[in-house]
């Protein structure tokens, strides 16, 4: 199995795990019971999001790496992740404003917190991918060395 397929499989497992934990958290009120549970979930969501972005842009990521351009890779990953997470936060505000749903508790400070911890998680996920690429020597294969 190639690395792209492994990344997708890990993404699917992590997404399913996150779904289960979130379902349990809502049922048992963990978001209200544990002070930093929301931060932990957004960090985990960032890792999951990074795995998805790595799978989606796999060839582009390898191209960045084959040109030894880590800075552009991290910037690209972070901007794409922030765009997706930002749209999610806009959706939360919209749903709360339009439908009067109050359990989302959308507010600017929470949104900033969500974006920060999600982005940190996405950087951890990207770092995992970079270490995997390095351990499998995929860069040499890309360069033809």
Question: Residue spans of the language-model regions?
Answer:
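Bulky hydrophobic segments
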Residues: 1-107, 112, 119-145
